[in-house]
Structure formats: structure tokens, C-alpha cells
Amino acid sequence: MRFTNPLLFPPPVPPEPPDRNSPVTPPRGPVPVPLPPGKGRHGGLDGGRRGSPEGQEDEEDSDEEEAENYPPSRSRPRRGRRRLHNKWDQNINYEPPAAPEDDWEDFCKKLTIPQFLF
């Protein structure tokens, strides 16, 4: 059982229920702005981002045309999540060079470890 001093740590007081006679306070935060009828959040009759009129296709919408806009020396920006580069990926099949096979006593002499510890 944990000792707690009631003078230093008073027991928690439950919150009082809201009074039914008090006026309701509006929630804090940004006030939503009503949109005009027929308009989406980004403009346009169809509610699209670019705001193009209905039935017309924008010239830059297709990926093929977008790829032609970039020179061949510079690739177009990728869409979607890019793979994170890990520095260990390039050496995933790396094997350390094989150690020369010495007998145990020579190994101990090289490391200056007393032999009686083994």
C-alpha cells in the first residue's frame, strides 16, 4: 500500500455536473464557413481541386502528357511513398574476410590474454 499524505495530495474531486439553467457555451475552435451551393471546398462545379468547368478535361491531367513536360535528363517527380534508403541495403550480402586459422595459443598471445583464464 502506498502512503499518501492527504494534506499534500488531496483526493480527486469529481467534476460538477453542468447546470441545466446555465446558457450553453459554444465550443471553441475555428468557425466553419458555409460554402455556396454547388461549390466544393476547392472550387469548381464538380468540387474538384482545379476548378475546371464540368465536362472539360484539363490539359495537364494525364500522366503521359505530364511525363512529356520533363526533359529526359531529369526524371519527373515520383508520386506516392518513396522507399527509404538504408545504408545497409547495399552490403546485404557482404561476408567478412575469413580469419586465418591459428591455434588457440597463438590467438591468446596476440591478444595478450593470460592462458590460465581459459
From Swiss-Prot:
Q: What does the sequence similarity comment in the record state about its family? A: Belongs to the papillomaviridae E4 protein family.
Q: Which residues fall in a compositionally biased region of kind Basic residues?
A: 75-85
Region entry Disordered, spans: 1-103
Domain of life of the organism encoding this protein: Viruses
Disulfide bonds, which pairs?
Answer: none
* Source organism: Canine oral papillomavirus (strain Y62)
Name of the gene encoding the protein in the UniProt record: E4
Query: What are the entry keywords?
Result: Early protein
Q: Where are stretches of biased composition, namely Basic and acidic residues?
A: 43-52
Q: Where is the signal peptide?
A: none
> Acidic residues compositional bias: what residue ranges?
55-68
Report whether Ubl conjugation shows up as a keyword of the record: no
Q: What is this protein called?
A: Probable protein E4
Question: Compositional bias of type Pro residues: which residue ranges?
Answer: 24-37
